[in-house]
Amino acid sequence: DRTGLEREIPGLGPEWSTGLLFEQDGQIDNRRQLMRALERACVSLGVRFMEGAEVLDLERESAGELCGIHLRSAEGEQQQLRCQQAVLCSGAWSQQLVPQLPVFPVKGQMLSLQGPREALKRVIFGPGTYLVPREDGLIVVGATSERDAGFAEGLTPDGQKQLQAGIASLLPTAATWPPMERWWGFRPCTPDEGPLLGPGPLPGLWLACGHHRNGVLLAAITAELTAGGVMKKAPNAAEEALLGAFRWNRFEN
């Protein structure tokens, strides 16, 4: 009820009278902390990063199997890397390498505000807008969902107005807090908004794409299923069911 809402979220907009409380709901700073931690962990295990490189094409044997990738380095040099297996995790751009994959971009705009420390202790999900608090008082505000924008870059007045309206509705006091950043990105979406996992249309190619808004949430199980496939580990019944449910060609009649 309203009393409970005010206890959990002081300053909540007056139009809200009921809500659902998820005690175990949380958040992580994926842009700054999570990705840096993952990079350090990968480097410690011997993973080599080629920053700024672009994969131009997948190399195939005469029988159609994957045999390598053709890429361009950050310095503009083209080269081939030989491999028998590869994982496609190119997000919204996955279809550029494998045209038959049903992955398309959904643009999202976001912004952040600097509020007082601990001004908001709960993540708030409203219709079309959410507020995510960080430890230092930073509030991340998201996000638009623009299915017709394609890969159009940049912020838009309509998108920013939507976010500002959401702030005013959910936490009116935050509307006066100074903005810190504004940015946009492209979610990798599929027709049913579920990911594409498991073997791809090219023998030797494994898929880990199309996660839409749930990339971080599904990262662990995606990694487990993908690593198992690459290592030729036989899936158990539960894993086999997941791989079947999220196969890339499930939309075909």
What are these regions (language model features)?
Residues 76-125, 153-157, 173, 237:
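Central helical "cap/lid" subdomain
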Residues 31, 173-253:
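C-terminal catalytic lobe of FAD-dependent flavoproteins
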